Every structure is written in structure tokens, then in C-alpha cells.
């Protein structure tokens, strides 16, 4: 699952569902048993993978995400289509968030 971060800084998402679009995600335990950092919205009772338009937005929002103690986290870029396949296979939605954790778009893969 390890991906190279090749998204140009400041690139705008035209449509988060475009299959060739790169997005930024948080990866838990990179280089080991890595997996996407998922979150759970208790009000809507939905599990989701947060995605971001930029690495900086992801890094800033990571500070407020629910995380495991003593676990390493890394922001990485991934092709949206690859993420959508993994999210669908594991029962996760995808939420496009801003740096403050506000939901900009909900995507059912």
C-alpha cells in the first residue's frame, strides 16, 4: 500500500471521485502492518477514511484525529481509485476534510 507522494503541492481536486486524482491520507504503522487511519462518526454511525487536498491539510488535521498511542503515523498520497477500492472492500466511506476536520464532501465508494 505504500505510495509515492507525487501530487503537486496546492493541486486542487476537480472532483474527488475522479479515478486518476491523487489525494492525501494518513497511514498508520508505515513500513510495517500499514493501514489507512480510519475514523468513526458516532452521530451518523459511519466509519470513514479522511482524505485531503494537500499534505499540509492532512498533517494539520492529524493532530485532532483519534489515534492509537505509541503508533507511528505518516501522511502519504494515493490515487483516489485505489483508496476507493480498499475503502469499499472494508466497509468505509471516504470523507474529504479540510485542515480543521470539517467535512467538505462525503463519498460512498
Give the predicted meaning of each segment.
Residues 2-109:
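Conserved NAD+-utilizing ADP-ribose enzyme module
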Amino acid at each position: 500500500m505504500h505510495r509515492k507522494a507525487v501530487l503537486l503541492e496546492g493541486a486542487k481536486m476537480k472532483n474527488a471521485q475522479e479515478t486518476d486524482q491523487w489525494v492525501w491520507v494518513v497511514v498508520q504503522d508505515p513500513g510495517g502492518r500499514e493501514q489507512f487511519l480510519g475514523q468513526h462518526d458516532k452521530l451518523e454511525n459511519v466509519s470513514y477514511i479522511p482524505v485531503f487536498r494537500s499534505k499540509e491539510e492532512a498533517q494539520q488535521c492529524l493532530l485532532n484525529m483519534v489515534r492509537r498511542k505509541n503508533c507511528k503515523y505518516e501522511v502519504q498520497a494515493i490515487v483516489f481509485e485505489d483508496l476507493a477500492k480498499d475503502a469499499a472492500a472494508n466497509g468505509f466511506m471516504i470523507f474529504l476534510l479540510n485542515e480543521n476536520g470539517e467535512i467538505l464532501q462525503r463519498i460512498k465508494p
